[in-house]
Swiss-Prot record:
Residues annotated for NADPH binding in this entry: T11, G12, S13, I14, R38, N39, N125, E127, G208
Key word Hydrolase present: no
UniProt: 1-deoxy-D-xylulose 5-phosphate binding residues: K126, S152, E153, S179, H202, S215, N220, K221, E224
PANTHER family: 1-DEOXY-D-XYLULOSE 5-PHOSPHATE REDUCTOISOMERASE, 1-DEOXY-D-XYLULOSE 5-PHOSPHATE REDUCTOISOMERASE, CHLOROPLASTIC
Catalysed conversion reaction: 2-C-methyl-D-erythritol 4-phosphate + NADP(+) = 1-deoxy-D-xylulose 5-phosphate + NADPH + H(+)
Family indicated by similarity: Belongs to the DXR family.
Pathway assignment: Isoprenoid biosynthesis; isopentenyl diphosphate biosynthesis via DXP pathway; isopentenyl diphosphate from 1-deoxy-D-xylulose 5-phosphate: step 1/6
GO MF terms, alphabetically ordered: 1-deoxy-D-xylulose-5-phosphate reductoisomerase activity; manganese ion binding; NADPH binding
Organism per entry: Burkholderia lata (strain ATCC 17760 / DSM 23089 / LMG 22485 / NCIMB 9086 / R18194 / 383)
Main function: Catalyzes the NADPH-dependent rearrangement and reduction of 1-deoxy-D-xylulose-5-phosphate (DXP) to 2-C-methyl-D-erythritol 4-phosphate (MEP).
Protein name per Swiss-Prot or TrEMBL: 1-deoxy-D-xylulose 5-phosphate reductoisomerase
Cofactor: Mg(2+); Mn(2+)
Length: 398
């Protein structure tokens, strides 16, 4: 039976990879809805190729632009805009599968709506779990939704784990691998002068700018530890992080009998996306087969928390619980945006997040509204801290 997809965040890197897989298997997948924020021209191209019933954008001006271009091309796609439209296409009867690939907190509400509608959810949006893990997982369980992780690390763990709960599968711990990003071998003192372009040059993966910066700070890996806690039901002390520069082993599961299972593959997001789309079957993802003889060597090392303070902050937030993870995520989003706009330096990202976590009193959220309130409060605090921060050094010439 053909799956009908709502693709949240279709113009980003995950969206591109998803549509590449979809195009390879038109007999298996069709597109009900595509969404973007303001990249209207790219969304128009996607709509003309995949003919969704609905397209959603962030604001009225972009909607008018997209609608005019689609009408001129003879498309019958309905164009909507705004947060409620994202929620509507995520819970619509027109789709059975929702690919949640919106970056940031904006993706939380539609992901939660998909869970409450009992959809099959291919989760690439970290914030649904980082900000409101208990609420989201309760919705998945209570409404019979199916959660399939798309992040390469969580997808790898999913493939290596038994289908039963972790506590009944003889699992000792799970190990998330990390490339270490572009600054793995840089001395911490030299990171003060890092530029946005340097931070976005990931050695192995092709990603958007925000997630590339998160990879450079290793905040991305910290958020993935929090995600893994909620997806697989393991406490933080049974989730390890291991730097693996080649990005060939995507994660590992260690069992009590001494066995360790790992999932390997070329660093291409089409592999985990294709696995999740076709699960429990496997389909061609358009990815080259892994040649271990050509790679020749796989290496590993423990993370250096002095070089990557954001990783330590994320682990601390998971340990503290309450709204700490939501505050961590919100402060990081604000700080990364400021860094990309050259308003703060690279090391100020961690300093901003740390200051917010130390300022905002932790509490147990009563519900989604409380989580969103904590998110807003953390963003306000982060903006205030950044406004008072010294300007970064002038970018050097290379």
């Amino acid at each position: 039976m053909q799956k009908r997809l709502t693709l949240l965040g279709s113009t980003g890197s995950i969206g591109d990879s998803t549509l590449d897989v979809v195009a390879r298997h038109p007999e298996r997948f069709s597109v009900y809805a595509l969404t973007a924020h303001r990249n209207g021209d790219k969304l128009v191209e996607q709509c003309l190729r995949f003919a969704p019933e609905v397209a959603v954008v962030g604001d009225a001006a972009t909607a008018a632009h997209v609608d005019a271009k689609l009408r001129a091309a003879g498309s019958k796609t309905t164009v909507l805009h705004g947060p409620q439209a994202l929620v509507d296409v995520s819970k619509s009867d027109g789709c059975d599968t929702v690919v949640a690939a919106i970056v940031g907190a904006a993706g939380m509400a539609p992901s939660l709506a998909a869970a409450r509608a009992g959809k099959r959810i291919l989760l690439a949006n970290k914030e649904a779990l980082v900000m409101s893990g208990a609420i989201f997982m309760d919705a998945v369980r209570d409404h019979g939704a199916i959660l399939l992780p798309v992040d390469s690390e969580h997808n790898a763990i999913f493939q290596c784990m038994p289908r039963d709960a972790a506590e009944h599968g003889g699992i000792s711990k799970i190990i998330l691998t990390a490339s270490g990003g572009p600054f793995r071998t840089r001395e911490p003192a030299t990171l003060v002068d890092v530029t946005p372009d340097e931070a976005c040059k990931h050695p192995n993966w092709v990603m958007g700018r925000k997630i590339s910066v998160d990879s450079a700070t290793m905040m991305n890996k910290g958020l993935e530890v929090i995600e893994a806690h909620w997806i697989f039901g393991l406490p933080g002390d049974r989730i390890d992080v291991l730097i693996h520069p080649q990005s060939v082993i995507h994660s590992l599961v260690s069992y009590r009998d001494g066995s360790v299972l790992a999932q390997l593959g070329n660093p291409d997001m089409r592999t985990p996306i294709a696995y999740a789309l076709a699960f429990p079957e496997r389909v061609d993802a358009g990815v080259d087969q892994l040649d271990l003889a050509q790679i020749a060597q796989l290496s590993f090392e423990k993370p250096d928390y002095a070089r990557f303070p954001c990783l330590a902050l994320a682990l601390k937030a998971l340990e503290e619980g309450g709204i700490a993870s939501a505050a961590l995520n919100a402060a990081n989003e604000v700080a990364v945006e400021a860094f990309l706009e050259r308003r703060i330096g690279f090391m100020a990202i961690a300093a901003t997040v740390d200051a917010v976590l130390n300022t905002l009193p932790n509490r147990t959220p009563d519900g989604l509204e409380d989580v969103l309130a904590a998110d807003a409060e953390a963003r306000r605090l982060a903006a205030e801290i950044i406004a008072k921060a010294p300007a970064p050094r002038v970018e050097r010439t290379v």
